[in-house]
UniProtKB/Swiss-Prot annotation:
Name of the gene this protein is made from: rex
Pfam family, one: Put_DNA-bind_N
The protein's name: Redox-sensing transcriptional repressor Rex
Recorded family membership: Belongs to the transcriptional regulatory Rex family.
Residue ranges the UniProt entry marks as DNA-binding: 16-55
Keyword Nucleus: no
Binding residues annotated for NAD(+), in chain numbering: 90-95
One GO location term (cellular component): cytoplasm
GO BP terms, alphabetized: negative regulation of DNA-templated transcription; response to redox state
Subcellular location: Cytoplasm
Keywords: Cytoplasm, DNA-binding, NAD, Repressor, Transcription, Transcription regulation
SMART domains, per the entry: CoA_binding (SM00881)
Amino acid sequence: MTEQKIPRATAKRLPIYYRYLNILLDADKTRVSSTELSEAVKVDSATIRRDFSYFGALGKRGYGYDVESLIKFFKKILNQDRLTNVALIGVGNLGHALLNFNFHQDGNVRISAAFDVNETIANTIQSGVPIYPMTDLRTQLEEQQIQVAILTVPSDVAQSVTDDAVAGGVKGILNFTPLRITVPKDVRVQNVDLTNELQTLIYFLEHYNSKE
């Protein structure tokens, strides 16, 4: 299969499919239809079939999809066989929560290094993760060859910290700050604005009738 770029919306749905397929496997279910998958993950079946079509013939008409085969396929696509080390930059309230969580449900992702300006927690180990002073950011990123970072620092330093992280070799940033950071073209940023998401949810609750 030749590698091709798929739509971003499709790429964001792949981990959702993969996680539910693992639930089916644990329940000893051997196959699933696009309709069943649709009901479980709340994505319409036509979209699921279109998403899967980007990767060729993954199912059979009248049979559906083989659960184990799909898991093996998406495991490869999502690099689930490879451990990805992640840097946590900023160990405040949100950072601490992420540090304690540390993606225990996902065996292929882990926070392996954290950074903070607070001298009382720098050079300590919390939840099994070493916390380095922010002055060591670039050096440690380079030495540990970490390419993915979670950014949970105050907005007023977000850009400068981002610049240091990129200089240290980071290619992907999960940005929890309200600031829309600027990065080179070869660096990918995913923005997670919890306030914005909550305000959007409230808007839909107030302006859209769920019974319609």
